[in-house]
């Protein structure tokens, strides 16, 4: 059984998680109010996207443009990779063409399934990583990490 966004939306509804299914974008978005994390617009919001790439053989949860790369994108990526090394399940990806620094959690589903608990754990892990890693990118003094 491949993973589908319809199945994912059903699981989120059963867990009473408010979400938006973007049919055109082929993703589900879940918005969280955060304690410390600020998105690149300065809002205390994390927008997690759930996708089912490879014909539903994987479940992928991301926060796109999670952090601004800053003047030194390599240093920012390195700081986040160091933070990721201590965090199970969550990684960092950088798309230099569009300067998209994203947080990502993926699970291989193949012909198995994904439980509601597993899905919620992936979403929670990405959002909690954004909260915790905020200081890796923007230290307490407010300046970008170098």
Each predicted region: which residue ranges?
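Charge-rich, low-complexity N-terminal segments
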Residues: 1-45
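Long, continuous compositionally biased terminal/linker segments
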Residues: 33-68
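Short, internal acidic amphipathic alpha-helical interface segments
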Residues: 57-100
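A short interface-forming secondary-structure element
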Residues: 65-68, 107-112
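Short, aliphatic-rich beta-strand segments
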Residues: 101-105
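A short acidic/glycine-rich loop-to-helix N-cap element
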Residues: 109-122
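Long, contiguous binding/interaction regions
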Residues: 127-132, 136
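Short, highly charged C-terminal tails/helix-capping segments
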Residues: 137-146
């Amino acid at each position: 059984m491949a993973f589908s966004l319809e199945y994912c939306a059903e699981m989120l509804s059963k867990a009473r998680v408010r979400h938006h299914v973007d049919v055109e974008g082929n993703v589900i978005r879940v918005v969280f109010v955060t304690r410390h994390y600020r998105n690149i617009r300065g809002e205390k919001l994390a927008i997690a996207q759930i996708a089912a790439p490879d014909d539903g053989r994987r479940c992928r949860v991301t926060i796109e443009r999670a952090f601004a790369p800053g003047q030194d994108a390599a240093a920012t990526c390195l700081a986040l990779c160091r933070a990721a090394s201590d965090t199970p399940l969550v990684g960092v990806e950088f798309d230099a063409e569009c300067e998209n620094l994203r947080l990502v959690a993926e699970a291989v589903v193949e012909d198995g399934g994904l439980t509601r608990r597993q899905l919620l754990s992936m979403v929670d892990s990405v959002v909690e990583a954004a909260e915790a890693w905020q200081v890796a990118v923007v230290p307490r003094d407010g300046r970008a990490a170098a």
